[in-house]
Amino acid sequence: MNCKQVFASLALGSVFYAGALFAATTQPNVIVILADDLGYSDLGAYGGEIETPNLDRLANQGVRYSQFRVTPMCSTTRVALMAGMSYPAAGNGSYKNVLPLPSLLQRGGYRTMMAGKWHAGARDPRDRKMFDRFFGFLGGLTDCFVGSNDWYTGQTQFRDFKPGFDATTAFTDSSIEFMGEALEDNVPFFMYVAYNAPHHPLQARKETVDKYIGRYMDGYEAVREARYQRQLELGLVDPAWTPAPHGVEVRRWNELPQARKVVEDARMAAYAAVVDEMDQGIGRLIAFLEEAGELDDTLILFMSDNGGDYNNGSIRTDADQIPWKPHNNPTSSNGWAWVKNAPFNFYKHACHEGALAAPLIAHWPNGLEGRTGQIDRSPVAVTDIYPTLLELTGVNFPKNDTSLKPLTGRSFLEGLTEQTAFDAPSRFLWFNQSRAWIEDDMKAVSLYGGPWQLFDLVKDRTEQHDLAEAQPKLTSDLASKWQAYAHEIEMSGRDSRVVGQQQAGWGWHRLQMFAPQLVSTFPANSKLTAPGTTRLEMRFSAAIDLRGAKGKFLRLFKVSDEQNPVWEMDPDASHPSQGKRTLCFDNIPALEPDTQYYVLVDPGAFKVAVSQSV
């Protein structure tokens, strides 16, 4: 298949619906609610123990999707939602030759409004050609109590962060205000509510956090297993799938010292509190619509932007992060990320299902009669929402405007309302050297530019049985389609390179974020079978400078003992690695079998190419 054929296969959905002269007799209101870094299993309706009665109500009175996919990253999903195509296809978020969804809905007579986190590329949400009303912030994260410098009400910078302010409440308040204005003016509305919850910083009221303290002392494995069992009871997952086990990046609960378990319980309690308070805000949105008599004829779509985030944090600072105080940055760890994404593999930033699987709840009483509480197994994706909303609202895509790129999604409105089968187009996934191509029921996926894997998503959506060796031709065909489409949309640089044969362990992406000149480590990061007698080695793309590093240590710890390093080193300019590209220590003590270790490096312990401090 040549490049143009590949692109045409992805664009088929837009040809299908745009050619039909659909005209709605009425224009229902639309609310899209986007959570930030919410895992697949966090909501009660998806197996979670967090108290989310309002979202559970929407699911129980509407339709929940079990095979909805987003993209691996906040910003790439947000662009895909607004553009109706992948982030790279939309000019890496530039929207070149792209007509954003709100702008098109405006042309169709809708009042378009947004409250929350933008982080969706180069288009400015303050532009009245995008949103008639806007309140929120532009970047990727914010302090939920005192904000940041990128908060705006329309074009006016917002600085009114008074004591008691919190982002979730503010976004809910603004959404209610904006919807009230539209109802008063008797115009249909598109309301985009993009909560920053539960992205870090995990900030919530003390009384909400306290409600969850102690609930997570059973540990990662027990909480995840309980979620998985509830998912089976709900019918969300296939019992034939093997739940993905955790890797070395997840510290084993039974090895953690008691003090660390208490900290980990508190970290997840903070996360649960943030989700809980978001659900409370959504409850207020529902109550407003009910009181206004608009709930039955309003389509509400709730979704997350990617799978659960991973962040082991720092043993030096985690206990000091107070969720109910400003200027703190509480996070949740890799272990809780594994829990959030149950039963799937990996986390945010990958192209495996742990990053892509997300909740999608559709609530529309007047349009979903007979579907109350149903689970829809259609493999819909975030790029399908744009064409679905066009068909719902009767707004036509300007198919004769040849300057515009075609949408790559396909409307699932008929499947939603009539329960007809959904014919999914091929899916192109990407983020920072990780990539995937999904076609029919098969998925080729690569992590960090490593070898392609192949999975049957019907039999093995948890990605535990790699078929690449057994089916090399199919693996090669799907990989070639990914490469051809990447070329068609003009991807360049390392993100579009042909994959290699070396597989970096989980977390390599984050290591390179903090040390971009890092080439490799020995033992490899997240290594399952490190040799018992070993050395510690870090290789860089430029020379290492150890001058001025005295008193800055590298330390090796057992997971079970955070107080006493099993090895530490304070290298200086006399070390043999000075001026070389490899920092090597051959005095590491013998490692114990079946034991987890990690390395901590003091800031400024060495520099790379003089200017790059690590």
Give the ranges of each region predicted by the language model:
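Compositionally biased, intrinsically disordered low-complexity regions
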Residues: 12-14, 311, 550, 607
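Formylglycine-dependent sulfatase
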Residues: 12, 23-448, 452, 459-480, ...
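Glycine/proline-rich low-complexity spacer/linker segments in large multi-domain proteins
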Residues: 497-502
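Short polybasic amphipathic segments
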Residues: 148-154, 454, 553-556, 604
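Bacterial N-terminal signal peptides
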Residues: 8-20
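Acidic, low-complexity Ser/Thr/Gly/Pro-rich repeat segments typical of extracellular/periplasmic
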Residues: 514-614
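N-terminal secretory signal peptides that target proteins for export/translocation
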Residues: 1-5
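Surface-exposed loop and edge beta-strand positions of immunoglobulin-like domains
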Residues: 71, 455, 586-589
